Regions:
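Sequence-structural signature of mature extracellular/luminal beta-sheet repeat domains
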Residues: 23-341
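Bacterial N-terminal signal peptides
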Residues: 8-21
C-alpha cells in the first residue's frame, strides 16, 4: 500500500490504562493490547517484540522462505527485495524488483509489493512500476503472469495469494502509479480483485472496492478476506468463494472507522492463522480479529504498518512497519502456503 504520512501515535499508555480497559505489554518498538482473553491465547502477554530491520523507506510484502530459513520483504521506494537471515542479518536479494524500465520512474513506489510462492515454490511478486504480476524462475528470469485485462494495462498490482488449486488472486489499486487515482496513465475504470486461473485466464472477481489491498484465505479456502485501504471506508470484506473460483458480493467482515483516533494507517496486508483468526494491518498497527469479526487485540506499532507474515516454524509473526521490520513469537500458527501435491 502507499505510505500514509500522518503524525505518529501518542506515547504508549501505562499497563492497564488502555482503551476498553485492555491490558498492554510494552517494548521499545511496539506494544500488545489485549481486548479479549482469546488474544492472550494467541500472543502471550509478555511476548517480546523485536526489531530485525531498520532504515528502510517503506517495507512491505513479508514472506518467509523456508528453503533458506530467511525472510524476504519489499522496500518499495528503493525498488528492491531485501532478505533477513537470523545469522547474516539484512542483505539485498533482488534489485529492480518492481520497475525494470530504462526511463526514470517519476512516482514514489516503483518497487515490488506483495510476495508469495506458487504451488511449485517459485517466487511470485507484484511489480508496481511494471504494472504486472511475475513469476521468478530459478535462473532469475521473470515470467509475466498478468499484465492487463480486456486489452487495458493493470493499475499496479498490490498483493496476491494462491488458492489450493493453483489459481492466483491479486488486488490492483493504483498506488504504484505516479499520480495514483488521478494518474493519466490509468487505463482501467475500476480497482479490482482479479483471479488468474491455472490456465492463465484472467477475470475480475470483485470491482466495487475503491482500494482493494491485502487479501488472504480462510483455512478451508472457502472465504477470501480483502482490505479496503481508504480512510473514508476502512473495512475488510469477506467473500464466499464459489465452486468456479468466482466470488459472491461479499459482506463487511470488520470496520476500523472508530480506531483512527488511536493510530495511523489504513487496512492493508493481512494473514490468517490455522484457527481462522485474521491478523490485519490497520489503524495503529496489527489488528487481530476472530473468525466472526470480533477485535481481540492489537499490536500497536506507533507507525503506519503495511503487512504481516508467519514464518520460522510457522508461529513467528513478522511485521513490516514503515521503515522497520519487527517480529513477535505467537502461540498460534499461520495457514501454510499451498503446495502442489
Amino acid at each position: 500500500m502507499n505510505k500514509i504520512s500522518i503524525a505518529a501515535t501518542a506515547a504508549s499508555l501505562l499497563w492497564g490504562i488502555s482503551i476498553l480497559n485492555a491490558s498492554a505489554t510494552e517494548s521499545p518498538y511496539a506494544r500488545l493490547e489485549s481486548l479479549d482473553k482469546r488474544f492472550d491465547a494467541l500472543i502471550a502477554p509478555d511476548a517480546k517484540i523485536e526489531k530485525i530491520a531498520d532504515d528502510l523507506k517503506w517495507s512491505e510484502g513479508p514472506l518467509w522462505d523456508a528453503s533458506t530459513k530467511s525472510l524476504l520483504f519489499s522496500d518499495i521506494p528503493n525498488n528492491v527485495i531485501m532478505r533477513w537471515h537470523p545469522d547474516k542479518g539484512v542483505t539485498r536479494f533482488l534489485e529492480r524488483s518492481g520497475y525494470t524500465g530504462a526511463a526514470p520512474f517519476t512516482g514514489y513506489e516503483p518497487g515490488s509489493n506483495g510476495l508469495t510462492f506458487d504451488l511449485d515454490g517459485h517466487l511470485t511478486l507484484c511489480q508496481h512500476g511494471d504494472r504486472r504480476i511475475s513469476r521468478r524462475e530459478a535462473d532469475g528470469t521473470m515470467v509475466p503472469l498478468a499484465v492487463g485485462y480486456n486489452g487495458k494495462k493493470l493499475n499496479s498490482p498490490n498483493d496476491l495469494v494462491f488458492d489450493n488449486h493453483g489459481a492466483l488472486y491479486f488486488t490492483d489499486p493504483p498506488f504504484g502509479l505516479p499520480k495514483q487515482f488521478n494518474d493519466p496513465g490509468k487505463e482501467l475504470p475500476f480497482n479490482a480483485v482479479f483471479r488468474v486461473a491455472p490456465d492463465g485466464t484472467i477475470s475480475a472477481v470483485a470491482t466495487e472496492l475503491e482500494a482493494p489491498n491485502g487479501l488472504g484465505f480462510s483455512p478451508d479456502y472457502k472465504t477470501l478476506y480483502v482490505a479496503n485501504a481508504r480512510a473514508a471506508l476502512p473495512i475488510w470484506k469477506a467473500y464466499a468463494v464459489q465452486p468456479d473460483g468466482s466470488l459472491d458480493k461479499g459482506r463487511v467482515f470488520a470496520d476500523s472507522s472508530s480506531l483512527y483516533k488511536e493510530g495511523d494507517g489504513v487496512p492493508d496486508g493481512l494473514k490468517v492463522d490455522i484457527h481462522g483468526n485474521v491478523f490485519a494491518t490497520g489503524p495503529g498497527g496489527v489488528l487481530v480479529y476472530s473468525p466472526e469479526g470480533t477485535l481481540l487485540g492489537r499490536i500497536l506499532t506507533g507507525v503506519p504498518t503495511s503487512n504481516v507474515a508467519f514464518g520460522e516454524k510457522g508461529s513467528t509473526l513478522f511485521i513490516t512497519a514503515n521503515h522497520r521490520v519487527l517480529r513477535v513469537r505467537t502461540l498460534t500458527r499461520g495457514v501454510p502456503l499451498p503446495r502442489r501435491k
